């Protein structure tokens, strides 16, 4: 089964840094010597918990150029620093940081366990496209998707599943993003559209053999079909 995934970060992820032109027409790097690096997560500014990019922008603008205390996570260690926002010609205050607070995509559901209503998907974690760091999530949505195309994998080139997650139904919630996959709970089983009467036993590691592999997929909400 193919499903859509929307992840919301715990704090905001720093995905880049750039110089800022201030009102004085000079170039500034307010992030310099703060210890903040790409891949870090900003979780608090002064006494405000940061949960989105918009909240960070608003909080920085409220500083009016005064020094602010930033709490961030660097390689699983919580750190703090002082940083002074730079006023731009448009009267905005900026830190010179590019940040992101969410990610989305489609992927295969690995399993659904009826007795606990839990699911696993992807078989690998979701990393940020810019930093390649595993995204530390605060919450997530598990939603239906419309599959548009499946590209078979070839030697040296992995296969791809393309789909859209716009205007789709909620299936459940995502609680964990790990290097082994995405995990969560199914709240709306009818939206997942699976036949729970046909359970399949998961093979043990020592039972797996090299050979042809197939996926079961529903294209355009039709009955599941098998694809090599």
Model-derived features: where do they sit?
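Conserved PDZ fold ligand-binding element
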Residues: 31-54
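Short, Lys/Arg- and Gly-enriched loop/turn segments at beta-strand edges
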Residues: 48-59, 80, 224-226
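Serine endopeptidase catalytic core focused on the charge-relay Asp
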Residues: 86-228
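PDZ/PDZ-like groove recognition
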Residues: 4-37
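Terminal peptide-recognition signature
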Residues: 14, 31, 39-42, 70, ...
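Short, surface-exposed secondary-structure boundary micro-motifs
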Residues: 47-48, 73, 218
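N-terminal targeting leaders that route proteins to membranes or the secretory/organellar pathways
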Residues: 1-13, 54, 65-67
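PDZ-domain C-terminal substructure recognizer with occasional recognition of PDZ-binding tails
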Residues: 3, 37, 57-96
């Amino acid at each position: 089964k193919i499903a859509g995934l929307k992840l919301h970060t715990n704090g905001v992820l720093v995905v880049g840094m750039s110089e800022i032109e201030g009102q004085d027409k000079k170039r500034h790097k307010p992030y310099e010597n703060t210890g903040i690096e790409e891949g870090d997560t900003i979780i608090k500014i002064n006494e405000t918990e940061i949960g989105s990019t918009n909240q960070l922008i608003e909080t920085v603008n409220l500083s009016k150029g005064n020094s602010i205390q930033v709490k961030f996570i660097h390689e699983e260690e919580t750190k703090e620093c002082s940083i002074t926002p730079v006023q731009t010609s448009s009267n905005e205050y900026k830190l010179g940081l590019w940040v992101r607070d969410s990610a989305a995509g489609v992927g295969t559901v690995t399993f659904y366990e009826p007795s606990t209503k839990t699911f696993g998907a992807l078989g690998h974690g979701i990393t940020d496209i810019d930093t390649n760091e595993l995204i530390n999530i605060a919450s997530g949505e598990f939603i239906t998707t419309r599959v548009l195309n499946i590209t078979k994998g070839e030697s040296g080139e992995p296969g791809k599943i393309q789909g859209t997650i716009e205007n789709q139904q909620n299936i459940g919630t995502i609680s964990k993003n790990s290097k082994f996959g995405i995990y969560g709970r199914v709240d709306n089983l009818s939206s997942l559209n699976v036949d729970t009467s046909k359970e399949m036993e998961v093979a043990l590691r020592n039972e797996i053999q090299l050979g042809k592999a197939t996926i079961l997929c529903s294209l355009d909400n039709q009955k599941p079909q098998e694809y090599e």
